[in-house]
Amino acid sequence: MASVAENRPVVPAADRKILLVGASRGLGLGLAKSFAAHGWTVVATERRASGGEGLAAAAAAANGHIRTELVDINDPQAVQTLRTQLSGERFDVIFIVAGVSDKDPTRPVHEVALHEAIHVFVLNAYSPICFAEAFFDLLKPQGTLAIMTSRMGSLTLVSTAADGSWEVYRASKAALNMLTRCFHQRHQHEGRTILLMHPGWVKTDMGGNDAPVDLATSVEGLYTTLISWHGSGKQAFLDYQGNELPW
């Protein structure tokens, strides 16, 4: 595992706070539970209230470590409303997990309806960066911005793909990677850490039952990797095992 752990001051987990965006299910929900279990204060968002299930149930069982908020990151007004609500808070980590896959990833791009492709690109690439820009000043000076991406967005690794599937999803994640690098260029002198994180092929609604990585393994790997880079002030593209990935 790659690591940049140095002699940086260690802040007790109990004093750390994370804004976790897109935590209603799957990886986002798993991360909310993991950070809370490690003693963090978690502000976790979902598009719609989950009632007594999902994130709401996790919050109820977390002894005050998880607080829920509503936001649709595709809705600029909703993003601004949340930004106003949280304006007095400061976060050690902002982790944007929200994303979507193509309804049928076996289709090549020319068979995907325009409105479907636009939805994937907006939610996977455009909206995460717009959200990051709106909330970046709520990160503490040594804070970390993490965004969930995929190795499928790597231009280098595309040659290792077994087939041509997931074309729209791959392209949207490549766009996210590029926009995040541009974001880093704008903010590189501010000292914060910016991480793009690949969770592995995980058994979730998106990953399916054939995925080789279980949710707990991915989530704990993401947590450990993020903590090892937190406070470094660097930018990196990493997988859940801490390996640096090629762009």
Named regions from a protein language model:
Residues 100-121, 126-129, 144-188:
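Catalytic loop of short-chain dehydrogenase/reductase
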Residues 59-77:
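Rossmann-fold cofactor-recognition segment
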Residues 199-205:
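Short, flexible catalytic-loop segment of classical short-chain dehydrogenase/reductase
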Residues 38-54:
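Conserved glycine-rich Rossmann-like NAD(P)H-binding loop of the short-chain dehydrogenase/reductase
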Residues 21, 91-99, 124, 147, ...:
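Rossmann-fold scaffold of SDR-type NAD(P)-dependent oxidoreductases
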Residues 189, 196-197, 208-247:
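C-terminal helical subdomain
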Residues 24, 28-33:
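N-terminal Rossmann NAD(P)H-binding glycine-rich loop of SDR-like oxidoreductase domains
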Residues 73-89:
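Conserved Rossmann-fold cofactor-binding substructure of NAD(P)-dependent oxidoreductases
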